[in-house]
């Protein structure tokens, strides 16, 4: 079986619009991967990420895209409140912003700060009368008015999180029954051993921060974190390790098992040993779980959202939209798009296919036209996509 290095990019736009689930299924199969160092490790980050004036990304036939909101410092995680308001983590600005479209124009007419002075906020979740925010070193919660989205009082600190090194994002998601809070914490490095076992892991705790423990481990940097609505399973999108070559290893999108181990730093995609890591732990590698869906090497998947709306065609219902921030460690760029993964009965049923594209004018060039980060399904079924390269939020609607 071929390695998933985005061969699906060959699918034409018409096929994507009509049948996004038509790609070859890899779910549950053991992938064949290239050898480590089959190519040199390339340092190839983009020089410029701002799009030219008037630019809009491409979407499949029948869909429409427009700018929903703009002029943010670093727009990242998106979340939809129970009342339909859109919450956005403007990470570079150290704040959480509320966006509204009361006249249903397709653009945010109202914009106000919910909380400021935060430390690189990212994850946002709602539970009872609280808005939860993942700062890089802690979980905070704010009591708020669920009708108006107005904050009621100061932040309450409920849990310390490890800090330092790389991978500062802290993503939050509540269990289907609301009794547990899941928190993703990335590693501090590429492949070094961690002193704090809570890194490169997904944690779980009570809504008040008590009884925290490791839920799943061996996850180098699980930036995306959400609960699948039908099954209640926890899913993550994972940024795998760098500097093994252009096509190794694939980043991935997978469900998690309580107590499951996913390889890092000893191995990747199951039992594929990283020769740089010494000493090895073969007993752990033997337990490493193969992820559900491979996304492609170095595409940098960040937030994802399960499509729970009714506006898009039936073939998109229940599937997942995955924002790919884009590569720096490939000679030719990969990612820089939003991909779609079809689901059936709460399980991934097909390879990912491109959905929002057009951000890379020249795969061998230095400039790109944006870097997707966040995705969320708006109350009307449109898809919202934050782009921290462009400093804006796009809205994708279906209008055949």
Predicted regions located by residue number:
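Beta-propeller domain segments
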Residues: 24-60, 169, 187-190, 197-200, ...
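Surface loop/turn motifs at the tips and blade-to-blade linkers of beta-strand repeat domains
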Residues: 67-72, 112-117, 158-164, 214-218, ...
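Structural WD40 beta-propeller signal
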Residues: 71, 81, 127, 175-177, ...
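Hydrophobic core register within WD40 beta-propeller blades
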Residues: 78, 124, 172, 222-225, ...
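Conserved beta-propeller blade signature
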Residues: 85-89, 130-133, 180-184, 233-237, ...
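A short loop-to-beta-strand structural motif that recurs across blades of beta-propeller domains
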Residues: 95-98, 138-140, 201-203, 252, ...
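Asp-box/WD-like beta-propeller blade repeats and closely related beta-sheet repeat scaffolds
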Residues: 111, 120, 125-127, 137-176, ...
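Blade-level signature of beta-propeller repeat domains, shared across WD40, Kelch, NHL, RCC1
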Residues: 376-400
């Amino acid at each position: 079986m071929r390695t998933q290095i985005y061969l699906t990019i060959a699918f034409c736009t018409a096929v994507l619009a009509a049948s996004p689930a038509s790609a070859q299924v890899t779910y549950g199969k053991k992938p064949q991967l290239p050898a480590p160092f089959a190519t040199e490790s390339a340092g190839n980050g983009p020089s410029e990420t701002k799009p030219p004036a008037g630019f809009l990304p491409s979407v499949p036939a029948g869909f429409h895209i427009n700018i929903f909101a703009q002029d943010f410092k670093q727009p990242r995680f998106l979340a939809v409140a129970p009342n339909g308001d859109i919450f956005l983590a403007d990470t570079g600005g150290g704040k959480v912003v509320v966006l509204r479209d009361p006249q249903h124009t397709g653009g945010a007419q109202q914009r106000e700060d919910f909380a400021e002075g935060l430390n690189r906020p990212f994850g946002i979740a709602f539970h009872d009368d609280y808005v939860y925010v993942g700062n890089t070193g802690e979980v905070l919660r704010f009591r708020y008015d669920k009708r108006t989205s107005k904050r009621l009082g100061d932040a309450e600190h409920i849990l310390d999180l490890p800090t330092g090194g790389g991978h500062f994002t802290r993503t939050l998601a509540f269990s289907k029954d609301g009794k547990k809070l899941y928190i993703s914490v990335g590693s501090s490095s590429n492949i070094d051993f961690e002193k704090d076992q809570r890194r490169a892991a997904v944690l779980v705790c009570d809504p008040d921060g008590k009884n925290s423990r490791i839920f799943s481990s061996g996850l180098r940097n699980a930036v995306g974190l959400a609960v699948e609505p039908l099954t209640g399973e926890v899913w993550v999108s994972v940024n795998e390790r760098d500097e093994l070559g252009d096509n190794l290893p694939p980043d991935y999108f997978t469900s998690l098992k309580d107590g499951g181990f996913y390889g890092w730093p000893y191995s990747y995609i199951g039992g594929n040993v990283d020769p740089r890591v010494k000493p090895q732990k073969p007993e752990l590698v033997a337990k490493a779980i193969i992820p559900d869906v491979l996304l492609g090497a170095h595409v940098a998947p960040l937030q994802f959202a399960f499509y729970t709306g009714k506006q898009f065609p039936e073939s998109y219902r229940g599937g997942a939209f995955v924002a790919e921030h884009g590569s720096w460690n490939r000679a030719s760029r990969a990612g820089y798009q939003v991909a779609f993964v079809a689901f059936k009965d709460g399980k991934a049923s097909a390879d990912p296919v491109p959905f929002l594209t057009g951000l890379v004018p020249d795969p061998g060039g230095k400039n790109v036209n944006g870097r997707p980060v966040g995705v969320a399904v708006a109350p009307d079924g449109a898809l919202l996509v934050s782009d921290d390269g462009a400093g804006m939020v796009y809205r994708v609607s279906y209008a055949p």
